[in-house]
Amino acid sequence: MPIDLIAAGQVLHRVHRTPLDPIFFGPGPGIAATNRFDSASGRFGILYVGMSRRGAIAETILRNPQRLMVSMTEITTRAISELSCIRPLRIVRMHGTGLQALGTDNAVSTGPYEPCGLWADALWDHADQPDGLAYQSRHDSSEICLALFERSDMAFDRKGMLPLSGILKEIAAILEVYGKSLSPVGPV
């Protein structure tokens, strides 16, 4: 199995609702799978992070490619946190060369969600006990994101949290790369 090691202390990026804790393995007990790699069986939660700030922002805020403007509400209600695991993470590479080694293709990053939850369950149960998987961002194929499995020995340090509204210049620059801009009012 193609497993990459992410060193303890490596900064990972998470965009989340401002009042909520950035460390959340969802979707939560009794809630049906809603995101790409959520466990199909519901036996464990998933924490979604980006390897870069830009990747985390793309996966969270740029979910509608047809919209040329991002609502300020999307910005004012969210923050970005830097997290780092206190131990190394063993991550299954579900992108690039890892796809062929696993016998799949990039539909795991762009296709229907249902098979992805089954992949998460299978990898969770695998004898190698990986901590999660790395996948190509659906909203920016140059970015790699992680779906981390809820494991009892996984703990994170919080390196910092910034409201997205506090880094508007950086957010605007990132959005410009994608040909988008900020809307000064509600949803557009």
Language-model features: locations:
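Extended catalytic/binding region for NAD+/ADP-ribose chemistry, centered on the ART fold
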Residues: F37-R67
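Active-site and NAD+-binding cores of ADP-ribose-processing enzymes
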Residues: M1-R36, R67-V188
